Every structure is written in C-alpha cells, then in structure tokens.
Amino acid sequence: MNTKLKKEIELIRYVRHSILDLTKQLNEVQLNHIPTGMKNNLVWNIGHMVFTQQMLCYTLGGLKPTIDMSYFAQFAPETTPSDFVTQQEIKKIRATFTDAFERLAFDIASGKLESYKSWSLPSGITIDSFQDAMITNAIHEGRHFGVIISLAKLMSQ
C-alpha cells in the first residue's frame, strides 16, 4: 500500500470516530429529526456515508460490497429519510459505519483492491483507480462531516 492510501485511511478513520463521538449522546428522536430547511437527518447522513463508501470503493470499481446493500439503499444519493429509524437499526448502522471502514482498511492492506474498473462521475470526472476512489470518498466524507456537525449543533440547542 502506498503512503497516500495510508493517509486517506487515517483521515477517514478520524472523521468516522469524530462523528461517532459527536453523536453518541443523542437519542433516536434527535438522530431522526430533520430540522426546518434541511432535507435529511443525522442517521441518514451516517448511513449515506456507509452506502457511498461501498459504492465508490467496491461496487463501481467492479468489486463485491462487504455490507447488505439492500438495507443501506435507503441512504443512497438522492434519497431522503422516509421512515423513523429505530434504536436497534441505529445500533446496526453505527456498527456498520465502523466495521465496513475497518474491512476496507483490511482489504487495502491485503491488496484485495488493487484492480479497479474505471468509471465516470456525473460531473464527467473519471475515477481510474482505487486511489482515486479513496480520494473521492475522503472528500465526500468530509462534506458530510460538516453537515453532521451542523445538524448535531442544532440538536444540542
């Protein structure tokens, strides 16, 4: 594994741990609440990050995802929360948030993700390698980290 991917792993791990710390004291009502002017909630953002990581790093690169994508499809791009997510489901999402990333880090270290099928984003930007996918994922997670910080502040008021 090259140094760049080690840095990406370190950055994404930091973001994910920070999100879990930031949201651990919030209850299921707070995690499900969609503030006025927003289109999604905290639990949707966390689930969306899981779904997107699997799409970018596995599915779109021609690899089999490591999670139940049928469950996480409710967090796909262009979706919005439609049902109240129970405490049991929140525990599952939070566990998968950690486990799926740690599996990704393991797959990188073991060389499983060296071959990657090229594909293009709707913007026309081409993702040619797994390293490109990791960079794109890190940017995406940083964006949602900012949203989660804002939503968590609103829930704390």
Q: What does each of the following model-derived ranges do?
A:
Residues 1-13:
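Extreme N-terminal tail/first-helix region
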Residues 9-10, 20, 30-77, 119-157:
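Short, contiguous alpha-helical
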Residues 12, 16-19, 23, 97, ...:
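Hydrophobic alpha-helical core bundles mediating ligand binding, dimerization, or RNAP-core interactions
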Residues 15, 93, 140:
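Hydrophobic (often cysteine-bearing) scaffold residues that line and stabilize catalytic clefts
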Residues 17, 28-31, 54, 102, ...:
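Generic structural signal for secondary-structure transition and capping sites
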Residues 25, 45-48, 107-110:
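Conserved catalytic core of Hanks-type protein kinase domains
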Residues 78-116, 132-137:
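Acidic/histidine-rich alpha-helical segments that form the ligand environment
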